[in-house]
Amino acid sequence: MGLLSILRKLKSAPDQEVRILLLGLDNAGKTTLLKQLASEDISHITPTQGFNIKSVQSQGFKLNVWDIGGQRKIRPYWRSYFENTDILIYVIDSADRKRFEETGQELTELLEEEKLSCVPVLVFANKQDLLTAAPAAEIAEGLNLHTIRDRVWQIQSCSALTGEGVQDGMNWVCKNVNAKKK
């Protein structure tokens, strides 16, 4: 009986599963970000034609990340993936200022979706390693993120290529999943 109780204690509690939806326009860096999270090679990334799913362990959670392609023709299918989403991560190419209006419209539509109501949102202001990248504060202002009142949100500067800022964003994700699941 003593050995059995020791074995039970050694067997860690199963990680809590979390469904994360990773969205953003094409070429924002979603797949690079996902591969960075999974510690995979990021030297050969091709546009996502459908979706990628990866499970990443972090802080006692099993994060099931759904990376959905961002091309205009794929975006109408995004809503097929909304069900049971715990966290929305929206990735923006901070250096592609010509598409800020388009990415803002897409984010606004997502925030209005009933199936995503109250779902915490992390906006990754990606590609901060580029000289032309807009700072996260400027992007937050341009997207009027300060007007979001129905959920917790965060904007995080990052570079999916170098990994800078990615872990800070994922720490926020785990903290807010913890708060949501309690």
Curated annotation (Swiss-Prot):
Lipidation positions, renumbered (N-myristoyl glycine): 2
PROSITE patterns: ARF
Residues noted as binding GTP in the record, renumbered to the chain: 24-31, 48, 67-71, 126-129, 159-161
A Gene Ontology BP annotation from the UniProt entry: intraciliary transport
Molecular function, one GO term: GTP binding
Compartment(s): Golgi apparatus membrane; Cytoplasm, Cytoskeleton, Spindle; Nucleus; Cytoplasm, Cytoskeleton, Microtubule organizing center, Centrosome
Transmembrane segments: none
Any matching Pfam family: Arf
InterPro entries: ARL2/3, P-loop_NTPase, Small_GTP-bd, Small_GTPase_ARF/SAR
SUPFAM superfamilies the UniProt entry points to: P-loop containing nucleoside triphosphate hydrolases
Keywords from the named record: Cell cycle, Cell division, Cell projection, Cytoplasm, Cytoskeleton, Golgi apparatus, GTP-binding, Lipoprotein, Magnesium, Membrane, Metal-binding, Myristate, Nucleotide-binding, Nucleus, Phosphoprotein, Protein transport, Transport
Modification Phosphoserine occurs at: 5
Cellular component annotations (GO), alphabetically ordered: axoneme; centrosome; ciliary basal body; ciliary transition zone; cilium; cytoplasm; cytoplasmic microtubule; Golgi apparatus
Listed PANTHER family: ADP-RIBOSYLATION FACTOR-LIKE PROTEIN 2-RELATED
Family that this chain belongs to: Belongs to the small GTPase superfamily. Arf family.
Database matches in NCBIfam families: small_GTP (TIGR00231)
Name of this protein: ADP-ribosylation factor-like protein 3
Organism: Rattus norvegicus
Lineage of the organism: Eukaryota, Metazoa, Chordata, Craniata, Vertebrata
Gene field: Arl3
